[in-house]
Amino acid sequence: MEKLVALSGVVKSYGDTSVLMGIDLDIAKGELIVLLGPSGSGKTTLLNLIAGIDTANSGEILVLGKNLSEMTDLELTEYRRDSVGYIFQFYNLLPNLTVMENASLGLELKGEELDYAKIILEKVGLEDKSQRFPAQLSGGEQQRVAIARAMAKTPALIVADEPTGNLDKNNSQSVRNLFKEISNDATIIIATHDNDYLEIADKAYELNEGKLIKIK
């Protein structure tokens, strides 16, 4: 399988606090990867490094064959904008925009892009609620809009940080199922403390005291 992400000897610390110590990780195109660990274990830090939001102290991070540490500021901005889709625990939907408008931020809602936006909403099961506003949706439905938004520019990589942390059991299961369904369209990395994600993972790792341990 084609390698999309490759980390080698990645170290990250904040002041005297070591967070990640010598992380090695290869992710193939189309894989769904789950990073498990309690709060403070470094899951979010690792996501941010891969997404180009933060920088490592040492080591190498290659995404799409490019070394993130060698990118210019402009190249990093373009990488974050065009190649990475983000999903967070809090949906961050704009309350005055409809489901369609939130899901398609950055697209022009006409012609082929309008057709594509409709396809995305169909994928996440919200095609019949495209003109509703966030306040009219359940928490699970709002997170589905956030997932659709992350897919809108067909990113190579989707990173999700505790995407079901605020949802009840039924909505959490629904969102996990959706991640599995869309994993054919993008490489997905999910950071979570929820062991139920092991069911959908192609590979899973646990962060423990700065080290990455493969558990699936």
Locations of regions flagged by a protein language model:
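Conserved signature/switch motifs of ABC ATPase nucleotide-binding domains
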Residues: R132-A135, K153, N184
